[in-house]
Curated annotation (Swiss-Prot):
Job description of the protein: Necessary for efficient RNA polymerase transcription elongation past template-encoded arresting sites. The arresting sites in DNA have the property of trapping a certain fraction of elongating RNA polymerases that pass through, resulting in locked ternary complexes. Cleavage of the nascent transcript by cleavage factors such as GreA or GreB allows the resumption of elongation from the new 3'terminus. GreA releases sequences of 2 to 3 nucleotides.
Gene: greA
The UniProt record lists the keyword Acetylation: yes
Annotated source species: Mycobacterium tuberculosis (strain ATCC 25618 / H37Rv)
InterPro entries listed in its UniProt record: GreA/GreB_C_sf, TF_GreA/GreB_CS, Tscrpt_elong_fac_GreA, Tscrpt_elong_fac_GreA/B, Tscrpt_elong_fac_GreA/B_C, Tscrpt_elong_fac_GreA/B_fam, Tscrpt_elong_fac_GreA/B_N, Tscrpt_elong_fac_GreA/B_N_sf
One Gene Ontology term, aspect cellular component: plasma membrane
One record GO biological process: response to antibiotic
Lineage, top ranks: Bacteria, Bacillati, Actinomycetota, Actinomycetes, Mycobacteriales
SUPFAM superfamilies referenced in this protein's UniProt entry, alphabetically: FKBP-like, GreA transcript cleavage protein, N-terminal domain
Keyword DNA-binding: yes
Name the UniProt record assigns to this protein: Transcription elongation factor GreA
NCBIfam families: greA, PRK00226.1-3
Amino acid sequence: MTDTQVTWLTQESHDRLKAELDQLIANRPVIAAEINDRREEGDLRENGGYHAAREEQGQQEARIRQLQDLLSNAKVGEAPKQSGVALPGSVVKVYYNGDKSDSETFLIATRQEGVSDGKLEVYSPNSPLGGALIDAKVGETRSYTVPNGSTVSVTLVSAEPYHS
């Protein structure tokens, strides 16, 4: 599995997401009991509590599947070992459209990574910008298409392994 096919997480983020998954799984019997209690109230066609409990169960199960998929494809605590190449787990600085006054520094990772200090923006390697930068070397210019259809060019200024 290559670095672009995995989700890079710090140990702290992995532990936080695993705890959330464990809590959701442990909560399954509570939701099932709630559904059963509401079912016993009578006519299901007009039972708002029953439908709300079923909707909550659906949302919870979707989040469980999302977390299981995320954690099964996670590479924990392993920032890229090399500098100068944009990879998941790299802190990168870019110039937009060749304008040195229009720069941004961010982490290429998932939103779930959620850098705790709040000082560093996070772009997914699956986002247009993150995907365009994967495997770029310092000095290289890449282009990507934004949702409105226009093309933006970015030049990689630096790429360093993330350290929390």
